[in-house]
Each structure stands twice: as structure tokens, then as C-alpha cells.
Amino acid sequence: MNNARPIRRALLSVSDKTGILEFAQALHAQGVELLSTGGTAKLLADNGVPVIEVSDYTGHPEIMDGRVKTLHPKVHGGILARRGQDEDVMAANNIGPIDLVAVNLYPFAATVAKPGCTLEDAIENIDIGGPTMVRAAAKNHKDVVIVVNAKDYDRVLAEMSANGGSTSHATRFDLAIAAFEHTAAYDGMIANYFGTMVPAHSSDECHDDSKFPRTFNTQLVKKQDLRYGENSHQSAAFYVDLNSDEASVATATQLQGKALSYNNIADTDAALECVKEFDAPACVIVKHANPCGVALGDNLLDAYNRAYKTDPTSAFGGIIAFNRELDGETAAAIVERQFVEVIIAPVVSQAARDVVAKKTNVRLLECGQWTAQTKGLDYKRVNGGLLIQDRDQGMVTEAELKVVTKRVPTEAELKDLMFCWKVAKFVKSNAIVYAKEGMTIGVGAGQMSRVYSAKIAGIKAADEGLVVEGSVMASDAFFPFRDGIDAAAAAGISCIIQPGGSIRDEEVIAAADEHGMAMVFTNMRHFRH
């Protein structure tokens, strides 16, 4: 093995002690001398693993309540020493080589995420010695192994066992990259935390304790290379946030089917996030990032049949998301009726897996069950910059709706208004959604004119033979003119939900009253671009 380096001395100092005892035992069995600190040293000693405390090794005690443990020339000289070049200096200063460093860092992210975390708590969980050792070992990867992730313990041990206690340069280099990624992410988290406490120099609007740091740092890890991007001439890859464990397309497990494409991932995200809005059994069918059919049902099969009925033409080649365990009967209805790119559900039953397995190209994903929506950020790339905002988790309750017309919505209309409003949140602006009895009747998406979105929703319903009469309508933003209300009335809409806020609200309300319609304002907009 070219550039092999034997491991004779290792320094182990970890906050997350997962697997460290077994790793230390295996290193000891291969004749490696072990150095360690604090809790790690105690864990090893308590379990009968011979270990030398770093303070005994350096001849200098830990000081300042443990703030200074490993910051010593015997430690860093041993890590940074260039084999074949620095031996005279090492001998003169009684420094021995350290061939392997296993370190993970104080749990800063977990600490600051805790309710009631103080600045002092955060400061005490900023690791100093750990990152210093990690960077030193990674810099000297020509001679030293650095391990920052417990999942790599077995990899290192296997290579040592196969090569007489030595590791290859390729392995050391790969682990060094992981180490620099680890420290970069760690420093980024700290910078983000402190960056929210000071005003950005470029804004007169900013204030202390902003949720947006003046310098934004994040780290995403490549999950997979994609065949191509949005179009075949664009290359692409899928990166994920390892700090997120929320049920999502990023954390989902693919059970079968072809590899996910760029567009599959984007559309699956849109479908899944929409279906999460509903408590009753629900199905969302998405095409080109827009819901083309959404419905509630007594069960998943009922919900799917009703969602499909909205727009069977657009559902062809679409993405289907559910908020319940996918059963065999529903899976059979899908694969027997239509061509589908992706099916995603929190859980997929064995019966459903067996059914979908007959269609080997269908991508079947299981994302796990979600509980409540978690706070997060949305990003939009612009040339030379990045727009960052809160994830749109705003939603009104029935009690918060403001009735602005003479006629008050019926109980049935109110239920449909709430359903329709949730769907509109996921339709590209300008968005108009018609719905009746927990089912979309028509969807008008992405038009520059709101009235044309309303017309398209009506056309869609007519094309599929769906009765608009008595349906409700949701608009993601206010109506600037009465023409949208007139178009809705002509189509048979009985009730409207919209944000309100136009300078012509009175004119719009008067139009609704003229048509005998009920209308409610949400005082909340749901633009989606």
C-alpha cells in the first residue's frame, strides 16, 4: 500500500461517545497507545481500556474549568510533526508522534436550540481545543488520520486490520476533507448564532436580535448526482441539510423505481408539503410544481379518486402524495388507472409495495410520519445573491375570518373555504382555486392576470364535466378590480376567501353583494413564485 502510515498512538476526545468505547478497544487490541481527556478517558478507564490522560502525558493539568486541556506543544507538535523531517525538533522537546486523532465537537447547535439557552451557555459550548486538533490533523493528513464521525470508526479499523495497522493516503485524505467540512459547518453555526445579535451594516431597517445573521453560513451535503437538471442540457445534484430530520423529500427513503430526477424532487416536495396541511385523509396530485388535484376523503382511496377527478389529463405523469399509510387498494387504483412518476406517503404498507413493484419504473417513497410543522427558512437564488425568508406556515382559523359581505357563509361553505385556502397556498401566483365538498373543482395557476386565473379554473372544471355551481373560490392575494368577482359569479361560485387589502375593496365587496355571494377576508396573503 503506497504512502502507508502505521498507527501507534491515538488521541481520543469526543463529546458524542457513540461507538468510542468499541473503537478504543479495537485500537488497543492492535497495539495502539491511547491518549484521552475528561469524560472520554473516564469512560475508557471504567471499562478496562488502558488510557493515558492528556494532562499526565503533557505534564500540565487541565486549567480554567477545562477550557485548556489539549492546547499544548506535546499534543499539537505530535499531530503536526512531519515524519522524516521534524524528528530532531521532536526529540529535543520530548514530543512523540500522534498518528490518529478522533474528535467530535461540543454540541453547540443542540445547546442553542434548547429553550432558555443563554449567551453564557452558548459560549461555554464553543469548542476550542477540539477544532484546533481536528484542523491540525487534517492539515497533516499525509501522516495522521483524523476521524470526526463515528460512522468512520469501522472503516479505519478495517483498513488497519487489512494492512498491518496502517492506513492509506487515500483514506487519510478523504477523512481530512470530512474534517474540514465538519469544522467549517461548526464555525458557520457559531457565526450565524452571534450574527443574529448585531445589526447588519447594510440596512437601516435591521435591529438587534434579528433572526437573519449579517453573514449567512450553511452546509449542505450531496445526497446524489442527478442525471440532469431542469432541462437535459443542465447538470445537477441534490444536496441535503443533515441537521434536518423533518419528514421531507430530502429525508425520504426510496423503496423502488428509477432514480429521482431534478424535476421529480421539486414536484415531490410541492406535493408532500401541501398534503401535510390536512388532518383528514388527503391526496395531492402535482404537475410542474402546481397542485392539479387535491381532495379529502373517508379513506385514502376515496381521497385519491376525488383528487384524480379534478384534472385527469394533468394527473398523467404527475406526483402523488398522501398523508396516511399507503394501502394496497389505493396503490392498485393508481397503477391500474394512470402513469405516475412518484408516489410518496409517510408509510407504505407491504401490500402497497407488492402492488407497485409490478410497475418497476414508478418511484415509491416513504418519508415517515410528521407531527407538527417545524419552523424553517426558504431560499431563492438570484443572480449574485440569495433571498431568505421564513417558511410560509401562516394559516388562519375559522374564527379569524372576517365576513365582509351581507351574506354569511354557511357551515359547509366555511369548511370548503378553509380547505380551498390551504390549497391556494401551494399554487403558483396568481392563484385561483375552486373547491366543493373537500375537493378541488378547478385550479388556475401562474397567470399574470388574476381574472385569467379565475377563468382558467372555470375552464378546467368545465373540461372535466365538474359542476362549479355552489363551489367556493380562494384567491392567494386580493382582487384589484371587481372583474374577478364577476367572472367567479358567472361560473357559479357562491363564496370567496381572499386576503383583502385592495384600495378597491369596497368595490369588490359591492360586486359580491350584487351577486348574492358571501366573501371573507383573511388579512393574510399567500404569494408563491
Curated annotation (Swiss-Prot):
The keyword Transcription does not apply. It comes from the Bacteria. Residues 1-148 form the MGS-like domain. SMART domains: AICARFT_IMPCHas, MGS. Pathway: Purine metabolism; IMP biosynthesis via de novo pathway; 5-formamido-1-(5-phospho-D-ribosyl)imidazole-4-carboxamide from 5-amino-1-(5-phospho-D-ribosyl)imidazole-4-carboxamide (10-formyl THF route): step 1/1; Purine metabolism; IMP biosynthesis via de novo pathway; IMP from 5-formamido-1-(5-phospho-D-ribosyl)imidazole-4-carboxamide: step 1/1. CDD domains: IMPCH. Disulfide bonds: none annotated. SUPFAM superfamilies: Cytidine deaminase-like, Methylglyoxal synthase-like. Its EC number is 2.1.2.3, 3.5.4.10. The IMP cyclohydrolase activity resides in the N-terminal region. Belongs to the PurH family. This is Bifunctional purine biosynthesis protein PurH. It comes from Shewanella amazonensis (strain ATCC BAA-1098 / SB2B).
